[in-house]
Amino acid sequence: MARYTGPTWKISRRLGISLSGTGKELQKRPYPPGQHGPGQRRKLSEYGLQLQEKQKLRHMYGVNERQFRKTFDEAGKMPGKHGENFMILLESRLDNLVYRLGLARTRRQARQLVTHGHILVDGSRVNIPSYRVKPGQTIAVREKSRNLQVIKEAIEVNNFVPDYLTFDPEKLEGTYTRLPERSELPAEINEALIVEFYSR
């Protein structure tokens, strides 16, 4: 399945979450597109709830179905809770951490920065958005890319960096200091439903 590249506001309204991180998609019409009001939302079956939760997480991180399932299966081989490990692996993606550091305003924008070669990991250029960053590794903007307007704008509006990251706004450089705890990952996701979905 290819990655969705259409308007994110439709997906945001359908799933009831903000994919842009701004929440603007849900401010005016916090109900799915095509419906005539908030009271028209259909009650979902158990399978429907599981599928919706899977789609929420998949679209949140901007991952196609094949990558998503591959990461899920990999998480199942790790010690600990399957669902929590799955979310930690997704959170450790390079494009996501570029977004978390505030170098991009959305994950989609962060993915483009990585793909276009603007990002370094431990001093080497990495252009693979799914690259898994390990604790202790450093993420930085290339010297030639430091004046990009999209990065400047993102830095101006970013006022929060998670505790598992450190960031130096002068150097445009951050470090993934440790793996995140569950309490630091998206609270609106019930990963148990995703585990149930793939266990059917």
Swiss-Prot record:
Q: What is this protein called?
A: Small ribosomal subunit protein uS4
Every copy of the S4 RNA-binding domain together lies at 92-155
Describe its partners and assembly state: Part of the 30S ribosomal subunit. Contacts protein S5. The interaction surface between S4 and S5 is involved in control of translational fidelity.
- What is one GO cellular-component annotation here? small ribosomal subunit
Keywords of the record? Ribonucleoprotein, Ribosomal protein, RNA-binding, rRNA-binding
Q: Which Pfam families match?
A: Ribosomal_S4, S4
Task: State the Gene Ontology BP annotations.
Answer: ribosomal small subunit biogenesis; translation
Task: Fetch the CDD domains from UniProt.
Answer: S4
- The answer on whether this UniProt entry bears the keyword Cytoplasm reads no
Its job:
One of the primary rRNA binding proteins, it binds directly to 16S rRNA where it nucleates assembly of the body of the 30S subunit.
What would you give as a GO molecular function for this chain, any one? rRNA binding
What are the start and end residues of every segment in region (Disordered)?
21-42
Regarding protein family, the annotation reads: Belongs to the universal ribosomal protein uS4 family.
What organism is this sequence from?
Geobacillus thermodenitrificans (strain NG80-2)
Species lineage, top-down?
Answer: Bacteria, Bacillati, Bacillota, Bacilli, Bacillales
